[in-house]
């Protein structure tokens, strides 16, 4: 039998806004770390006239910019996906892979909408397929 605290915690977590914001923050953190890691691996073209200190500062700025961009992208992706999945789950009153596919489509379409309708459709299909494959790989739903 769950305690009152466990029931309250579950009620808070069932709130779509809480899920979305939490996923956005976690996605932003992941994007920040990935940006730092990938920025460190990047081999920028530096001028031979730059001193070691100038090269270090240039590389640090590039890493920071890449990290910030990755942070924003992953935060938005996590927030949109989580919010869409939660809303669809509550509307359908089911917890299955269809929710993941719809949320993936919404996320992919909205993330690539700036490229026009064709890009939005490709983003929708691609992210939906990717989301379902990840879902099947981790087998969250039984």
Swiss-Prot record:
Essential core component of the TIM22 complex, a complex that mediates the import and insertion of multi-pass transmembrane proteins into the mitochondrial inner membrane. The chain crosses the membrane at residues 21-41, 70-88, 97-113, 120-137. This is Mitochondrial import inner membrane translocase subunit TIM22-4. The lineage of its organism: Eukaryota, Viridiplantae, Streptophyta, Embryophyta, Tracheophyta. Belongs to the Tim17/Tim22/Tim23 family. Keywords: Membrane, Mitochondrion, Mitochondrion inner membrane, Transmembrane, Transmembrane helix. GO terms for biological process: protein insertion into mitochondrial inner membrane. It comes from Arabidopsis thaliana. Pfam families: Tim17. GO terms for cellular component: TIM22 mitochondrial import inner membrane insertion complex. It is found in: Mitochondrion inner membrane. It is a multi-pass membrane protein. InterPro entries: TIM22 (IPR039175). It comes from the Eukaryota. The gene is TIM22-4.
